[in-house]
A protein has these predicted regions:
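N-terminal domain-onset segments
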Residues: 1-54
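Short, compact, well-ordered microdomains
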Residues: 54-90
Length: 90
């Protein structure tokens, strides 16, 4: 079976800590969605979770999850363990 290696790509990411800085994180996601011209509702911070609407449906980030801005400007959450295995700080 063929194997593939992930291309080295630099991404932007912020950790969701469910604290006062979460307002800034929500603004960052919403500003990015607006800049891309994506017709989805705004991200919201509800009951300690961050809800990120995407064209595929809502994604929920919990405390400690990383919010990634992908290569196409899309936003999605990533669990801390997966993030640590996949990314390193540049």
């Amino acid at each position: 079976m063929p194997q593939f290696k992930k291309k080295p790509v630099i991404i932007e990411a912020r950790q969701f800590n469910n604290d006062s800085e979460s307002y800034e994180l929500v603004h960052w996601v919403n500003e990015g969605q607006y800049a891309r011209g994506v017709d989805v509702p705004f991200a919201t911070w509800i009951n300690g979770n961050l809800i990120i609407p995407t064209l595929e449906g809502d994604h929920t980030a919990s405390t400690g999850d990383w919010i990634i801005k992908g290569v196409a400007g899309e936003f999605y959450p990533c669990k801390p363990g997966i993030f640590e295995q996949t990314y390193e700080k540049v």
